Amino acid sequence: MAADSSLEFLKSVKGVILDMCGVLYDSGEGGGRAIHGSVEAVKRLMDSGLMLRFCTNETQNTRERFVQKLRVMGFDISVSHVFSPAPAVVQILQKRHLRPHLLVHDDLIPEFDGVDTSSPNCVVIGDAAEKFSYQNLNEAFRVLIGLEKPVLFSLGRGRYYKETDGLKLDVGVYMKALEYACDVQAEVVGKPSSEFFKTVLNDMNLQPHEVVMVGDDLVNDVGGAQSCGMKGLQVRTGKYRPSDECDPSVRADAYVDDLSAAVDAILTNR
């Protein structure tokens, strides 16, 4: 791919942050499947000498199980290079001496080993999938409404995501329901939180203008990165929709067909 004057901003890039679901793979039955060309694209980035990190709002598995699933697909990824909301919220809970009521996926529960959940004084909500029943949502509501100062943590705030059989509602929908019912504003842990992105940047030891984010979610991936001073590329895979390219509130610095094309652009124009 020839150098493109519209991609001049890539010349200063020393590091890349990749979203995972919708960029590397589509989730679904059997663990999902890798998006065409993404395994090789990740390898090319690793071989390029650029700093590489992975940033996900995945909350249906522990990081270890999540990375294991990706390795089965062919990705050579280290757990220490993957940043997800659950470990981050555990640190917050411990620092603030909070005891959560958990409305999360069963497979995420091990992330909270050692966290005191007796007599809850806050609620943590993640992508609970089938556990988002009326009964479970109402139980979380009752905990929140019964607190003098309700505290709600949401592991991301996505509206929907793509699985192999179609789009699925994400945690943000249920977060909004609890916010409305309890007149409380959730503390978002994960993308698009600036603090979450700053944690990744600190680990890379790079400045925001030296890093580009590649994601399929215009608001949480691209917009979140841009709010921290990074550039954002949106791929036309995963939850991408053509209407994203004329969104009035967030505009990606560039749009590319897939991760392979994003890597072509980054390596050619840096």
From Swiss-Prot:
The gene is lhpp. Phosphatase that hydrolyzes imidodiphosphate, 3-phosphohistidine and 6-phospholysine. Has broad substrate specificity and can also hydrolyze inorganic diphosphate, but with lower efficiency. It is found in: Cytoplasm; Nucleus. NCBIfam families: HAD-SF-IA-v1, HAD-SF-IIA-hyp3. It comes from Danio rerio (Zebrafish). It comes from the Eukaryota. InterPro entries: HAD-like_sf, HAD-SF_hydro_IA, HAD-SF_hydro_IIA, HAD_sf, LHPP/HDHD2. One of its GO terms (cellular component) is cytoplasm. One of its GO terms (biological process) is phosphate-containing compound metabolic process. This is Phospholysine phosphohistidine inorganic pyrophosphate phosphatase. Signal peptide: none annotated. One of its GO terms (molecular function) is metal ion binding. Keywords: Cytoplasm, Hydrolase, Magnesium, Metal-binding, Nucleus. Its cofactor is Mg(2+). Its EC number is 3.1.3.-, 3.6.1.1. Belongs to the HAD-like hydrolase superfamily. Disulfide bonds: none annotated.
